Amino acid sequence: MYQILIGCVWQKSPYINQCTEFQPPLSFVTPERMRRFMRCWARLELVYMLAWIVTTKLVKATRLDFTWGPGEPKRILEASCGSGPIMKGQLFTSPNIKNLLNRTTGIMVKAHCNPPEAILWVDTPPKPVWVNPFAVVQGLAEDVTNGNMPQDFKEKLLFALDDSLSQSQSSPDEILGPPPLGCFTGPFFLSPPKSKDIAEGLKDSCIPASYYANLQKT
């Protein structure tokens, strides 16, 4: 399959041979040989370009791309737990988005994750925002409780919200409220009298998100 020519190894290929075989000094290069060289160079450039495009597409197909369009919230629910950028050791602080209340068009809660994930879908531009799941579920429960809707529907919705947290062995305490910003857990994880101390501000119950991120790595 290979031949030796002027100390160089070249493969029997109608295109590669023309590009790799020995060329005489520049003073002996004819216009025909120059045109042949340019054609070979163009072919090689095309091969490299196609290989780069294919490689780029394959890499993008194996990771979660955080550039979102209006019809792509479903991709968030299909993604594995911990795929959101907020889950990678960052604390749950207030989202840095102006007018968040009026710009939020949807709320998603991934209850099967441990800890659960809550994502706000924000418009203009459309994108997901990972937020404190316990605070979100607590806020939704309060809205449903005070909302003007049929009682049977209200009870079913409250049960679904409570179940979204009970899947991860936790449920919010209605009196003590949601955990502080930057924390996953809250007073509802502890039994009295510790819960009373936390409610009165005598004890801190904050466990940062980085704690759960480290658990996922181990």
Curated annotation (Swiss-Prot):
Annotated disulfide bonds: C81-C113, C183-C206
UniProt KW keywords: Disulfide bond, Fusion of virus membrane with host cell membrane, Fusion of virus membrane with host membrane, Glycoprotein, Host cell membrane, Host Golgi apparatus, Host membrane, Membrane, Viral envelope protein, Viral penetration into host cytoplasm, Virion, Virus entry into host cell
Source species, domain of life: Viruses
Membrane topology type: Peripheral membrane protein
Predominant location: virion
GO BP term, example: fusion of virus membrane with host plasma membrane
Annotated ranges, domain gL alphaherpesvirus-type: 60-218
Keyword Protein biosynthesis belongs to the record: no
Glycoprotein found in the keyword field: yes
Subcellular location: Virion membrane; Host cell membrane; Host Golgi apparatus, Host trans-Golgi network
A single cellular component GO annotation: host cell Golgi apparatus
Annotated segments matching region Interaction with gH: 57-185
Gene3D superfamilies: 3.30.390.170
Oligomeric and partner information: Interacts with glycoprotein H (gH); this interaction is necessary for the correct processing and cell surface expression of gH. The heterodimer gH/gL seems to interact with gB trimers during fusion.
Family to which this protein belongs: Belongs to the herpesviridae glycoprotein L (gL) family. Alphaherpesvirinae gL subfamily.
Annotated HAMAP family: HSV_GL_alphagamma
Annotated function: The heterodimer glycoprotein H-glycoprotein L is required for the fusion of viral and plasma membranes leading to virus entry into the host cell. Acts as a functional inhibitor of gH and maintains gH in an inhibited form. Upon binding to host integrins, gL dissociates from gH leading to activation of the viral fusion glycoproteins gB and gH.
Protein known as: Envelope glycoprotein L
Protein's gene: gL
